[in-house]
Design a protein with these regions (language model features):
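Glycine-rich phosphate-binding loop used to anchor ATP phosphates in small-molecule kinases
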Residues: 52-94
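Walker A/P-loop
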Residues: 16
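Conserved substrate/cofactor phosphate-moiety recognition/catalytic segment
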Residues: 20-66
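ATP-binding Walker
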Residues: 13
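Hydrophobic anchor at the beta1->P-loop junction of P-loop NTPases
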Residues: 7
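P-loop (Walker A) phosphate-binding loop of NTP-binding proteins
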Residues: 10
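Small-molecule kinase domains that catalyze NTP-dependent phosphoryl transfer to phosphate-bearing small molecules
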Residues: 115-157
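Conserved phosphate-donor/acceptor-positioning beta-strand/loop module used by diverse small-molecule
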Residues: 93-112
């Protein structure tokens, strides 16, 4: 049975790091769909309403449903802007969606950003512009992840939640 893990939250919250660790934990054949890779690297478009990444992300979620046991969708993925992706995911995966929202204070995300390899690409000003406080989705039933949880704990919690349902 196919499962979808959705990791959402503001820039610098640890989504990509957790997605990569989950991919290693689940093993080969686990599909990671990174909003940054699709939007910034593949299409090179701004994150604005109706951007070209939305249908491609949707198509990749569909591909994951058809070809991967576990698909991980990660990114800022603003709740209002990416509703189309979430709605299609809900149609495909039903109750096999494990959605998490990294609900961290801005200062924590800024601190974490300073440890990233791409820290020189953008800074505090851009992160403040992109910031959305508690941007939970109406479509996804998201479990909050707070600053007190460490990466290993997050990975194991999600891994066991998915395996328990398998």
């Amino acid at each position: 049975m196919a499962a979808l893990i959705v990791l959402r939250g503001n820039s610098g919250s640890g989504k990509t790091t957790v997605a990569k660790a989950l991919q290693r934990r689940f093993g080969r054949g686990t599909l990671v769909i990174s909003q940054d890779d699709v939007r910034r690297n593949m299409l090179w478009v701004h994150d604005e309403p109706g951007n070209a990444a939305i249908p491609l992300l949707t198509a990749l979620v569909e591909y994951g449903h058809a070809h991967a046991d576990v698909t991980i969708l990660e990114g800022i993925l603003y709740a209002d802007r990416y509703q189309e992706v979430f709605a299609r995911a809900r149609q495909l995966y039903g109750t096999e969606i494990f959605a998490y929202y990294f609900d961290l204070p801005f200062e924590e995300t800024l601190e974490r950003h300073q440890t990233k390899p791409n820290r020189g690409e953008f800074g505090e000003e851009a992160m403040r512009r992109w910031w959305r406080e508690r941007d939970y989705s109406d479509i996804l039933e998201e479990t909050p992840i707070g600053r007190e949880m460490k990466r290993e704990e997050i990975v194991e919690t999600i891994f066991h939640a998915v395996r328990k349902n398998a």
